[in-house]
Amino acid sequence: MDSMPEPASRCLLLLPLLLLLLLLLPAPELGPSQAGAEENDWVRLPSKCEVCKYVAVELKSAFEETGKTKEVIGTGYGILDQKASGVKYTKSDLRLIEVTETICKRLLDYSLHKERTGSNRFAKGMSETFETLHNLVHKGVKVVMDIPYELWNETSAEVADLKKQCDVLVEEFEEVIEDWYRNHQEEDLTEFLCANHVLKGKDTSCLAEQWSGKKGDTAALGGKKSKKKSSRAKAAGGRSSSSKQRKELGGLEGDPSPEEDEGIQKASPLTHSPPDEL
């Protein structure tokens, strides 16, 4: 037999050494983009569109809550001890300052609803996932998760970042919010602040996203439950007022008075005498 060519024999001898070197080499580290992609699979921080959307939502709510008062703020003393004209609180600088200083703290009342898509993942109330897990724990089921039970109700990283970005946004666009408050309240705040200024020339698709709600969703049905309670209270109040009117008109209509009712109730029943003996 012919012997194996010299170059081929050398390759066979070097092959085990190459395999050994490959095994000893350290694993390649993930680049920033790859690491960020893996992190985003679990934590997806809010976009600027989502931040502005919920800042506008809470600003609307806060201005609506503070706009129901008729309080007048005094501006000081007038000339020659005359009473100075006051300013309505609803048009005052004080109202604007109080709302903008506390607006970002309101975002900490939100929770992350991972079962929802888009910007609807941010909403008040407990998410369906954690509500189900809490119900299982209360029923005695042992639930094993990477997050300890004590931290289930803690603020998520996404909501904390939502509040952080809110602080920056309100400070950066303070003059825009003030301009809307003084001159453009007839315009929609979301359109004025977000579409026309904060997100001008950028993606505004999240502003049109609305959550329709699902059956049994406590976060979506909170308002409906309160309406039902209020209607029941009104009905109960109507019944009590009508019964009160009937009592007041009882004497005119010839209804028995309470004393007469008491006498009728306390009247002893007729007794039967034993039969006569023959």
UniProtKB/Swiss-Prot annotation:
Glycans are attached at residue 153. It is found in: Endoplasmic reticulum. InterPro entries: DUF3456. Residues 215-278 are annotated as: Disordered. Residues 233-243 have a biased composition (Low complexity). Residues 47-271 form the Saposin B-type domain. The keyword Isomerase does not apply. Residues 1-30 form the signal peptide. Disulfide bonds join 49-206, 52-194, 104-166. It comes from the Eukaryota. Pfam families: DUF3456. One of its GO terms (biological process) is innate immune response. Residues 153-179 form a coiled coil. GO terms for molecular function: signaling receptor binding. One of its GO terms (cellular component) is endoplasmic reticulum lumen. Keywords: Chaperone, Coiled coil, Disease variant, Disulfide bond, Endoplasmic reticulum, Epilepsy, Glycoprotein, Immunity, Innate immunity, Signal. The keyword Chaperone applies. It is linked to Developmental and epileptic encephalopathy 60: A form of epileptic encephalopathy, a heterogeneous group of severe early-onset epilepsies characterized by refractory seizures, neurodevelopmental impairment, and poor prognosis. Development is normal prior to seizure onset, after which cognitive and motor delays become apparent. DEE60 is an autosomal recessive condition characterized by onset of seizures in the first months of life. Belongs to the canopy family. Toll-like receptor (TLR)-specific co-chaperone for HSP90B1. Required for proper TLR folding, except that of TLR3, and hence controls TLR exit from the endoplasmic reticulum. Consequently, required for both innate and adaptive immune responses. Interacts with HSP90B1; this interaction is disrupted in the presence of ATP. Interacts with TLR1, TLR2, TLR4 and TLR9. Strongest interaction with TLR4. This is Protein canopy homolog 3. The gene is CNPY3.
